[in-house]
From Swiss-Prot:
Activity regulation annotation text: In bacteria displays feedback inhibition by L-serine.
Name of protein: D-3-phosphoglycerate dehydrogenase
Key word Transmembrane present: no
Species annotation: Bacillus subtilis (strain 168)
Family of this protein: Belongs to the D-isomer specific 2-hydroxyacid dehydrogenase family.
Length: 525
């Protein structure tokens, strides 16, 4: 049974994919109430209230995936998640329309003084001259960050007859033309816009993006909107600009500290403030819960997730193409690790053929994960394999090869240790499956699975016969045997597979055979 803890309030309709599944148990409790059973959950679903910290990861020892029902993941320690091998997903599309509409409602309210006029009328006043506003038509809207939400806002602004100037370092001219916006530098947006709205994540680069210095570059009378993340606008700088008259008004849905207590900015008469309502519509709450539920269900079935924060994103079709190589990469990593009983400094991976056009970083991490699992006593998977390798002083690299091996696709790995190097080449052949086709320069062909024995020996008469006799005397049936050599009478290798694991005494007997150099036991899934 795959156990899911839902620690924040979510739409039950959105959770239906999990509720209806016959192999998933869903528990709706906050973290404190679930304290005694935290170690039993495979998945955790949160909104913004639950803080997913190092301490929580340490308690949730079975945790494999965290789903954030929303876009922002500020409340989740992504580095700790990665370190613990936990995938973090979000719902990047679920609240796009809701947030875009809220942003535009804030813009309209700010331009027409709607909240202030509403309070005035309810106070039995009728002061029309005090609330003369400005039209949106003909104004320039500056958008900082043209992601999904920014694009929806641009579309609505154009419908109001506004000119839209956008700063986004990843915006191409082609996309700008398609959306109908003007691509500008950040400074150009500051200088030209009548209204500026920010739609970026909160990062080291965007924290305080609109500060005393940058606000001073804006038009006098500019209006500023933040429905993205608290901290993108420096609140102290904004308050100063409102008080000196440079900024004509601000609409804020997010704050540096939430809820904002004793906040002079919130109290300012030219500020419209809402309590982080961007995603607070019935439709958005249903959408984000449904999106993360579907993703967690996919994960529980062993299928790829589309919105992982700390893994490469890929579609089902892309995953279908990559899956065979992902599986064999983990196996060859494990094979090398079990054969090299020495400290390792470097893992170099090479891709050849059409596989090189796929998301090779995912395959690389699968290989690293397979390599590290026999060597460490902590959780290792594709999420944290790179970090675990670096912690242990193991460098890794990947490159694309243009050489011809005779196979449509190949993965090769060269592992460098204190005393030796080890190389393996593998491929996947449709209808025939996974194959190891080279080990340490020896051509060979075998299916990497189950109980294996890798033998290095001299190519002399009788070695194979003596190996067979020892195994037969111990009632061991050989499932498959492959041999490889470079030249007659020189070094050779033998790879055998069995239906069960070999006992140590049999390995010792094999090791004592004349002309056998080494015997390595390998167990693969």
């Amino acid at each position: 049974m795959f156990r899911v803890l839902v620690s924040d309030k979510m739409s039950n309709d959105g959770l239906q994919p999990l509720i209806e599944s016959d192999f998933i148990e869903i528990v709706q409790k906050n973290v404190a109430d679930a304290e005694d059973e935290l170690h039993t959950f495979d998945a955790l679903l949160v909104r913004s209230a639950t803080k997913v910290t190092e301490d929580l990861f340490n308690k949730m020892t079975s945790l494999k995936i965290v789903g954030r029902a929303g876009v922002g993941v500020d409340n989740i320690d992504i580095d700790e998640a990665t370190k613990h091998g936990v995938i973090v997903i979000n719902a990047p599309n679920g609240n796009t329309i809701s947030t875009a509409e809220h942003t535009f409602a804030m813009i309209s309210s700010l331009m027409r003084h709607i909240p202030q006029a509403n309070i005035s009328v309810k106070s039995r006043e009728w002061n029309r001259t005090a609330y003369v506003g400005s039209e949106l038509y003909g104004k320039t809207l500056g958008i900082v960050g043209l992601g999904r939400i920014g694009s929806e806002i641009a579309q609505r602004a154009r419908a109001f007859g506004m000119t839209v100037h956008v700063f986004d370092p990843f915006l191409t001219e082609e996309r700008a033309k398609k959306i109908g916006v003007n691509s500008r530098t950040f400074e150009e947006v500051l200088e030209s816009a009548d209204i500026i709205t920010v739609h970026t994540p909160l990062t080291k680069e965007t924290k305080g993006l609109l500060n005393k210095e940058t606000i001073a570059k804006t038009k006098k009378g500019v209006r500023l909107i933040n429905c993205a993340r608290g901290g993108i606008i420096d609140e102290a700088a904004l308050l100063e600009a409102l008080e000196n008259g440079h900024v004509a008004g601000a609409a804020l849905d997010v704050f540096e500290v939430e809820p904002p207590v004793d906040n002079k900015l919130v109290d300012h008469p030219l500020v419209i403030a809402t309590p982080h309502l961007g995603a607070s519509t019935k439709e958005a709450q249903l959408n984000v819960a449904a999106q993360v539920s579907e993703e967690v269900l996919q994960f529980a079935k062993g299928l790829p997730v589309m919105s992982a924060i700390n893994l490469p994103a890929m579609t089902k079709d892309e995953f279908a193409k990559i899956k065979p190589y992902h599986q064999i990469a983990g196996k060859i990593g494990s094979l090398v690790s079990q054969c090299m009983k020495e400290p390792v400094q470097d893992v170099a991976i090479q891709y050849e053929g059409t596989i090189a056009k796929l998301e090779t970083s995912f395959i690389t991490k699968a290989l690293l994960s397979g390599f590290l699992k026999p060597r460490v006593d902590s959780t290792v998977n594709e999420v944290n394999a790179g970090g675990v390798a670096k912690e242990r002083g193991i460098s890794f690299s990947e490159k694309i090869s243009s050489s011809e091996s005779g196979y449509d696709n190949c993965i090769s790995v060269k592992v460098t240790g204190d005393r030796s190097t080890f190389t393996v080449t593998a491929t996947y052949i449709p209808h025939f499956g996974e194959r190891i086709v080279e080990i340490n320069g020896f051509n060979i062909d075998f299916y990497p699975t189950g109980h294996l024995v890798y033998i290095q020996h001299q190519d002399t008469t009788g070695v194979i016969g003596r190996v067979g006799r020892i195994l037969g005397d111990n009632d061991i049936n050989i499932a498959t045997m492959q041999v490889g050599r470079k030249e007659k009478g020189g070094e050779a290798i033998m790879m055998l597979s069995f239906d069960r694991h070999l006992e140590d005494k049999i390995v010792k007997e094999l090791t004592n055979v004349p002309d056998i150099v080494s015997v390595k036991l390998i167990d693969l899934p």
